[in-house]
Amino acid sequence: MKERQLRATELPLLDLATAYIQAGETLFLAIHDDIAARVRLAHPEAAHLEISIDADGDVRLHGIWSAQDSAIGSCHLLYDPHDDPERDWLDGPLDLDELVSDLNRVLEGSFLYHWGVIEPHPVHEHRNRRWITLPPADRAATIAAVIRRHVPDAESLVCRFEADHKGIAVGFEQITLSSGERVNIPCPRCSPESEDSPWPHDVSHELARVLGQLYIMPHLRGLHLTPCVDLASEHEGQLWQLVFPYREPGSVQPSAHG
């Protein structure tokens, strides 16, 4: 006899809390994506929004900034909000009232804070302001670029995800190279002393944040992540494979794994 699926109201309280948080995070990340798309329509190089939140919880936009320039070590101010009607042409296709309204929506809860996209302002004199990092325009390409900085001939990544009321935890299993070779990634919980990780610990955090967003947003999960099986894995639970964007053969030197 087929098992009856539990209704939402019949789920244990912890499962209900997890489902509620995941639904909120999915919605707010989707709004965050939409904000980024509209900002980049006017300012393609945009990477950060500088905002403040007053005592009533209302958001004020102070600037739109580029990513950090490695050559000079700072960001470029792309747009400085103003109250001068004669300078409205500088706004381009960006509707600032609509943008601020959506920022108010996503910042009234704590969901985006869990993903590390909202941080204190990097300049101490503006410490009462917030620094919002916009999501990558292409998360899969961003993940591939980060990993290929450390493993140049990487072609795919296998990982697992654990969802609970605290968020999404990401476990890295292995990388597949262009030669077909598989490189296992040590688990920090199972092998805390291992130094064989292909990238530094802070890179794992950077990757986990973007991978978690791919997983929690259904349309991105369906587009980029494929369920897979590895009988040799030391961990239980579903594994997922992310195949990296195509690259011209011979464009990189083989890495020294093996």
Residue ranges of model-derived segments:
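Acidic, metal/cofactor-coordinating or nucleic-acid-engaging core segments within structured domains
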Residues: 157
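Detector for the mature cores of small, proteolytically processed
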Residues: 3-10, 14, 18, 56-139, ...
